[in-house]
């Protein structure tokens, strides 16, 4: 079984491709009870997630640490746009991981006021990601252990998950979010896909009902009208 956490779809896409090629099942961890899953010798368990602040998202950490991996072969795949930092090691401090891999995907984090992908660069990254996944799958099928193939970055101290507690405390506020009511059509997609259930539709318009969210960027990236700012 392959568990994934995905906001914009990058990690979900990777998880589903791997699951399809390995005759496995891809399962979103959102609203799932980790204690309802247990595995043993001969089983295979995967965790696929995006890199947040050079670490694993809190929702993935809280899920993985409560899953009974047992003697199953356990692997992790993290998706990233720049470098992975020590995201796999971070998750590995909560759950046993036999091998881990990184897959570079298009950037979808507009919070830092930077220019995201052009269509051309996104297509190039997706093609490279397909090749990368094809490299990873045989290693998973062979249950290779001790393989940690990621892109940590030039400065392992700078690209460290040590800053993740700060991100959790200060970087997940919903206060900056707002909706352009001239563009919003009240479709409710943002409310339905928010993994933190932080969005509610009031009078046909989204409001952020929680002070903290996952900062997954699903609402920003998937709004069909680009109404969420």
List the predicted regions and their residue ranges.
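FMN-binding flavodoxin-like domain, especially the glycine-rich phosphate-binding loop
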Residues: 2, 6-13, 20-32, 37-49, ...
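Iron-sulfur cluster-binding cysteine motifs and their immediate structural context
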Residues: 179, 185-208, 218-229
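A short, structure-level motif marking secondary-structure boundaries and short turns
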Residues: 76-77, 174-176, 204
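Generic structural signal for beta-strand residues in well-ordered domains
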Residues: 38-39, 67, 170, 187, ...
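A mid-sequence, solvent-exposed acidic-amphipathic segment
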Residues: 154-195
